[in-house]
């Protein structure tokens, strides 16, 4: 799941693959802004067949947070 999510970050958001680790913070380390976060949520919902509500979205601080959610819910 990590590799699939990492590839999305590289392909869609143009993030340097070397910067993407499980511990990398979405906003601080990867520079993802609110519009990109909305795109991230939409794409994850479509690609991984999950629903991410606002309450869950606010818990996503790191790449690992998103990956663990996707692993548990897809």
Where are these regions (language model features)?
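Thiotemplate assembly-line natural product biosynthesis machinery
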Residues: 1-18, 71-73
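Phosphopantetheine carrier-protein modules
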Residues: 12-31, 48-59
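Two-component histidine kinase catalytic core, primarily the HATPase_c
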Residues: 36
């Amino acid at each position: 799941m990590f590799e699939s999510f990492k590839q999305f970050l590289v392909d869609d958001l143009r993030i340097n693959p070397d910067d993407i680790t499980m511990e990398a913070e979405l906003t601080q380390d990867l520079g993802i802004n609110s519009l990109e976060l909305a795109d991230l949520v939409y794409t994850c919902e479509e690609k991984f067949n999950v629903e991410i509500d606002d309450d869950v979205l606010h818990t996503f601080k790191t790449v690992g947070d998103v990956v663990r959610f996707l692993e548990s819910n897809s």
